Amino acid sequence: MHKVLFVCTANIYRSRFSEEVYNYLARKVLLSSRAFSAGLMVGHYKTRTIYAPAMEYLNRLNIIPRRKDELSIHINDLDLDEYDKIICMDKNENEPMVSANKRLHCLNIEYWDIIDEPMVSRQISLPKCYERVENLVNHQIKEPKH
């Protein structure tokens, strides 16, 4: 099974939203692929679940989150060898954190441009995030099976 890891700073907003959208869309088309998510600087967010505005948008999309009650996870707590693709949500924000984490130096990380609140409103970032995830799933469908 193909596995994707979405990464943001705190693992409560963009990466969690992307994980839930990806898994919903992949299940819908019977794609043998699943996503998970983690944060680069989880810190005190380890006691937080998915951000309420992300939950609200998922509800509007009729997506029932599978991990809505689970707490944030730091990227260092995962076996990164399990993932075929690692995507950081915002290059400008996340690349310095990736560079500071020696565990991540040898990984091939894809960077998106989904900017966090308050820099960009959720009315812009969440639809953009959905579109990027949907495009990723559609690309996976078209990719030849190995």
Predicted feature descriptions by range:
Residues 22-25, 53, 90, 98, ...:
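Hydrophobic alpha-helical segments
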Residues 1-77, 145-146:
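Conserved active-site segments centered on acidic
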